[in-house]
Amino acid sequence: MSVNGEWMSSDGHYPYTLRYGSAEGDLSSREKRKNTDVQTFRAEAGLYGNFSDKEQWRLKAYYFQSSRGLPKATTFYNDHSTQHLWDKNTFIQSQYKKEFSQQWVFQTSAKWNWSYQRYLDPDTKNSLKKTENSYYQQEYYLSASVLYRLLSNLSFSLSTDGSINTMNADLNNFVQPTRYSWLTAFAGKYVNDWLTISASALATIINEDVKKGGSAGNHRKLTPYVSAAFKPFHNEEFRVRFFYKDIFRLASFNDLYYEEVGNTQLKPEKAKQYNIGLTYNKNVCSFLPYLSATIDAYYNKVTDKIIAYPTKNLAVWSMKNL
């Protein structure tokens, strides 16, 4: 069993020089940044158990909360700033693993996650004289995987993950999205004295529904991965490695549905990743018993990259594809 916690508080009032003009001799003053306070609290607890050498389980609980000011830029010598953000997050997750034999291994895990965020701007020029939004999100997650060792140097695995994500807010006509995700991966690995090869295929099925308005749509995708490591010299620990990965990332609920921030027209971010590398290990002498050198080159081709860009309010950004 393990338990730990952490609390942090900072006023963030760091000093800066405010200049009243750009010409030499213009007045200046020493100021302190305002509305930069941060308070955070985190607590974790874990339980770990072994039913036998081949059967284990784990349980973890987590809680986090924060309160932070959102400072604005000093514009025309006005440093007034009152916007604030509160966050809370908690989850419980468990994992179970059992080796039925040298050939078969089963593993499953489950998780429940809850998060809350509140944003306040008491200086908004509207009929309420403020902007105040609260968002609530939940996730239910379940996964299972099985590993089969066909030979001592050849193994296959099949894993599947399912999750349900929901979001709500105290806003009129909020869309209230629900996302159903199902991911299934089939993988294989072969190892001998001079070659290691791994390959997998990931099938992703995403269905997204909303109670009001428009959703970000449904998605179907099959993405491959392959990697290899080659040892050309029997007596030297020198290896040549490479991998190729085709993957995509969906926009989060925050990216899609947050007030003033979200953009339901966001496309998934797609990436093709390439890597080639060299690794050399050597036992040199008693003074230098172990030497390792690694060099890698990466190439990523990203399309429809999801980025955040500032709006007229520096504390509120918006999302788009690049």
Task: Kindly label every feature range from the protein language model.
Residues 7-11, 63-67, 112-116, 162-168, ...:
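Transmembrane beta-strands of outer-membrane beta-barrel pores
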Residues 10-16, 20-23, 29-42, 48-106, ...:
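Flexible loop and strand-edge segments within Gram-negative outer membrane beta-barrel domains
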Residues 1, 39-45, 88-94, 110, ...:
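Hydrophobic, lipid-facing positions within transmembrane beta-strands of outer-membrane proteins
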Residues 103-119, 233, 240-243, 269-322:
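Membrane-embedded beta-barrel scaffold of Gram-negative outer-membrane proteins
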Residues 155-235, 244:
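Signature of Gram-negative outer-membrane beta-barrel scaffolds
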Residues 52-56, 99-105, 149-155, 194, ...:
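Short loop/turn motifs that connect adjacent beta-strands in outer-membrane beta-barrel proteins
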Residues 13-21, 64, 69-78, 118-127, ...:
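Outer-membrane beta-barrel translocator domains and adjoining extracellular loop/strand segments
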